[in-house]
Design a protein with these regions (language model features):
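Rossmann-like dinucleotide/phosphate-binding beta-alpha-beta segment
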Residues: 131-164
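Phosphate/diphosphate ligand-binding glycine-rich loop within oxidoreductases
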Residues: 47-120
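N-terminal glycine-/charge-rich "phosphate-binding" loop or analogous flexible N-terminal tail
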Residues: 1-46
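Short gly/ser/thr-rich secondary-structure transition/capping motifs
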Residues: 28-35, 48-52, 121-129
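Rossmann-fold NAD(P)-dependent oxidoreductase module
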Residues: 22, 104, 108, 152-156
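Phosphate-coordination loops involved in phosphoryl transfer and adenosine-cofactor binding
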Residues: 2, 86, 137-140
């Protein structure tokens, strides 16, 4: 009998199904299932769970849980709400994700910093009115959280002259 690993998530049905399929293909010798599909006996046998934006309370029904593998970068809520030190909570660190997110933060910051919505409006109205230019060094950008994603975004903003 294959070991059972619940996939505990708070995703829309389409995304949950896609993740479930990918996980099952990647681990053919493991039965990936919803936590709601497990019997009381099976719940007691679970030592590993895979999660994606879960409600941490959903994991509390697994009395022998030892390892939680998060497919998402952020695990703060899990750490805050699961106080059992015997459970290892492991998160995904993807350097490419950090770079991609930092590029998006930089792009949107420049979009707003250089007042692109106003210029697009002028373009639609066939107008050209020069706007005041504010230097990046005069603009402060706040980042909520300096984990891997936030730190990379902050570094890119600093490299481009913004105060962070």
């Amino acid at each position: 009998m294959n070991p059972i690993v619940p996939f505990v998530q708070n995703l829309n049905e389409k995304d949950a199904s896609a993740w479930h399929e990918v996980l099952q293909i990647a681990m053919p010798n493991v039965k990936i299932c919803k936590i709601s599909d497990l019997s009381k006996h099976e719940l007691k046998s679970i030592s590993v769970a895979i999660v994606a934006n879960p409600n941490p309370a959903d994991l509390l029904c697994l009395p022998n849980l030892k390892w939680v593998q998060s497919l998402w970068a952020g695990v703060e809520r899990l750490l805050d709400e699961i106080s059992n030190e015997e459970i290892s909570i492991v998160r995904l660190i993807d350097p490419q994700l950090s770079k991609t997110m930092a590029e998006a933060v930089l792009a949107w910051t420049f979009y707003l910093h250089r007042n692109m919505p106003e210029y697009a409006k002028q373009q639609n109205n066939k107008e050209w009115l020069q706007r005041d230019v504010i230097l990046a060094s005069k603009r402060t950008v706040g980042i909520l959280g300096l984990g891997h994603l936030g730190a990379e975004a902050a570094r890119r903003l600093l490299d481009n002259g913004f105060k962070v």
